[in-house]
Design a protein with these regions (language model features):
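C-terminal non-catalytic regions of proteins with extracellular/luminal or membrane-system context
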Residues: 1-254
Length: 254
């Protein structure tokens, strides 16, 4: 579990306290959690990870054979009543249809926001609270808009990026940077989406409409999320990000 709140920044370095390692952040696994997953692998047939956090974390461990995690579910902070629904999801009584509302990167330090946070204690202010501050400098490139724009412009393959030593080493290419993109989500069934009609107008004051047919191609009932993105053209030298989310709709149970 991880907690976070307005005005409460997350530590960039936990400075090793017996369960953590120097250089690790609050949004990485600590030693207790790693040992627990190793125990689960050695003593149980299946390991399912529940992410009880409101923030995106580093979850590259899902790809590791060391822990053999078979499934992972981000549950946010559901509360006591919400956990009843979580039980139904992991047992298959209910089919999940949620989608991520943020980009989950393998390494937090590949996100520019990582470098805009620090503490505000002066060198001679030993009695002052060591509160952290965040300097907002990203402009419009927040969340998925940064990652998708950087990919569209080739930044993740450029020497400026690949030559930089990030917290967890070096990375190159979108697939090595982004583990789960904005809007990602799985289901116990599969779906097919097909655009059957579109009414697209280039006039800025007109509405555009796209009709999508959703077909459940699996054997379990479920809901699908239709997501519409666009890459708008540059106009009047206005700053522009690569991909814009323009709409989403969830289907009925099919």
């Amino acid at each position: 579990s991880r907690t976070a709140a307005e005005g409460s920044a997350l530590s960039m370095d936990l400075d090793g306290d017996g369960s953590t390692v120097n250089g690790t952040t609050y949004l990485e696994l600590d030693d207790n959690e790693r040992n627990l997953m190793k125990f689960c692998k050695e003593n149980f047939k299946h390991t399912i990870v529940l992410l009880n956090t409101s923030s995106a974390m580093e979850i590259g461990f899902l790809d590791s054979e060391e822990y053999n995690v078979e499934a992972c579910l981000w549950i946010g902070h559901p509360g006591d009543a919400g956990l009843v629904g979580v039980g139904k999801l992991i047992t298959g009584a209910v089919n999940p249809s949620g989608r991520l509302v943020d980009t989950w990167a393998y390494d937090l330090s590949t996100n520019p926001t990582f470098y805009n946070m620090d503490n505000n204690r002066y060198a001679n202010g030993q009695d002052a609270d060591n509160n952290t501050f965040y300097q907002y400098e990203e402009g419009i490139y927040v969340g998925y808009r940064f990652f998708e724009t950087a990919d569209a412009e080739g930044y993740f393959d450029s020497p400026a990026f690949t030559g930089h030593a990030f917290k967890n080493g070096t990375a190159a290419g979108y697939e090595q940077v982004v583990q789960f993109p904005f809007g990602f989500g799985l289901s116990y069934t599969t779906f097919e989406q097909k655009i059957i009609d579109s009414d697209v107008k280039l006039d800025a004051h007109e509405q555009n409409a796209v009709t999508v047919r959703v077909t459940n191609t699996g054997s379990v009932g479920g809901k699908e999320v239709v997501q519409l993105y666009m890459d708008a053209p540059y106009q009047s030298d206005t700053e522009h990000f690569g991909i814009q989310g323009r709409g989403l709709e969830k289907s009925k149970v099919t």
